[in-house]
């Protein structure tokens, strides 16, 4: 059984609640399949934003929408114990209803750096943390008893009684991953894989190989696994105006990769055909003049290498098809730029019908 091809929108939890809810509602009206919320961390203050709890925001979104699926894309078990993650997932099930919630877990390299996790000398890496988190969360959400003594986490909970008012529906769990170890873990232990920003079609092909290898090792059917790719994007009837938002978001992410997660990001940049020396001026511009100045440092050639879903509706359709053909089954479009609600509407009118 293969998974359906879906197109959704991803935003970061770094803007006021009302604004994020309005965007989710606009995406629902436009016909997008999923609204993902990635948890922003205090690093985004450098760009004039404030970090907020994505789990709190998504519960509000779920209660104020009707059809669109809501996804955590991602939250980190370095910030929440798996038992707490399961408790917050219960709230999402209550607010959204069965079948409207996807649970994404990831290490978040930038946050690990901020809180000192994953440093040299630590006993266990992200793969152990993710595996144990999935073990605990999945059993609790299924209503089972937990008596868990892992390398990282300890957890104890009795089984859910029949009379308890709680959903028994299965919640799909995803792992956000850039490297091969976690990508294979997504194949063996999760329902799907979510890739990081600056994903390109070549990176999708790379991730698909690792995801399917993990699935085969676990005796699972590779075609049943979902592969989501976070791709910066923007749209306008005018091609150049349609690329402005994607250019600015690409600038913020590329600067982040230079400043915070060099090393782990190499494979992303390699698959995009980018060198650190090529994008270092973007980070310099960010430090000196902020995100608008950094956007000016993103050349047309760099934006082309990033393979953003940006420009006119026809250009966006062409790029989405490229990702689909590379093996991406879940487009996570990170819309940025002026009037994102209108951009979502234009995607709904002129792009989404081509993929239905």
Predicted regions mapped to residue ranges:
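An alpha-helical appendage that flanks or caps ligand/catalytic pockets
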Residues: 123-164, 204-209, 213-325
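Conserved, mostly hydrophobic/aromatic
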Residues: 31, 61, 92, 137, ...
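Acidic (Asp/Glu)-rich catalytic clusters
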Residues: 25-29, 58-67, 89-101, 187-188, ...
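N-terminal beta1-alpha1-beta2 module of alpha/beta enzyme domains
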Residues: 1-71, 171
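Glycine-rich, proline-tolerant flexible connector loops at the mouths of alpha/beta enzymes
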Residues: 36-61, 76, 109, 114, ...
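Short, acidic/polar
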Residues: 15-27, 177-185, 312-322
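Alpha-helix-loop-beta-strand connector modules within alpha/beta enzyme cores
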Residues: 48-71, 129, 133-136, 140, ...
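Hydrophobic faces of well-ordered beta-strands that scaffold small-molecule active sites
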Residues: 5-11, 35-37, 69-73, 101-105, ...
